[in-house]
Regions:
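A short acidic, Gly/Pro-enriched loop at the edge of an enzyme's catalytic core
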Residues: 1-9
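Hydrophobic beta-strand segment of the Class I
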Residues: 9-10, 98
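Short catalytic micro-motifs in class I SAM-dependent methyltransferases
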Residues: 12-16, 44
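A short glycine-rich, Lys/Arg-flanked "PGG" loop and its adjoining helix->strand segment in the class I
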Residues: 24-36
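Conserved beta-strand signature within the Rossmann-like core of class I S-adenosyl-L-methionine
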Residues: 34-46
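C-terminal alpha-helical "lid/dimerization" subdomain adjacent to the S-adenosyl-L-methionine
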Residues: 46-101
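Core SAM-dependent methyltransferase catalytic element
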Residues: 95-122
Length: 122
């Protein structure tokens, strides 16, 4: 991607579909198009370091989908379709990578279950 003078960049549930080996390069390109004080908003599905807690949050999300009228079959089919395509990472992995590519400060500013938005300041 080509970016110039990007004061705000928003990546909503995008990075999780980029192969892990290319994520740093993409974020480095974004950062290089930003000036100090510019902002990146990064929203992603997270995986938690505690497997039991991670599974619990996934089940809560599935319960939410059921309440919205999705069948168990639809939920299972979507999960299988995303199985090897959506590769989530931990909060720590995201924060470390953002620092590595040159963002000075970053942290989660919003989270619901295992979906989070991070803010990173160039």
């Amino acid at each position: 991607i080509q970016l110039e003078n990007a004061s705000v960049v928003i990546l909503n549930y995008t990075l999780q579909f980029v192969p892990i080996k290319h994520r740093e390069t993409l974020l480095r390109r974004i950062r290089s198009a930003m000036q100090p004080g510019d902002v990146l908003i990064l929203s992603e599905k997270l995986t938690l370091p505690d497997p039991q807690l991670n599974d619990y949050l996934i089940e809560l999300h599935h319960n939410f989908k059921r309440q919205q009228g999705y069948s168990d079959l639809e939920i299972a089919q979507k999960r299988q379709a995303l199985e090897d395509v959506l590769i989530p990472e931990t909060r720590h992995q995201h924060v470390e990578r953002l620092h590595q590519v040159g963002f000075s400060r970053c942290d989660i500013w919003f989270q619901c279950l295992n979906f989070a938005s991070l803010i990173a300041i160039a």
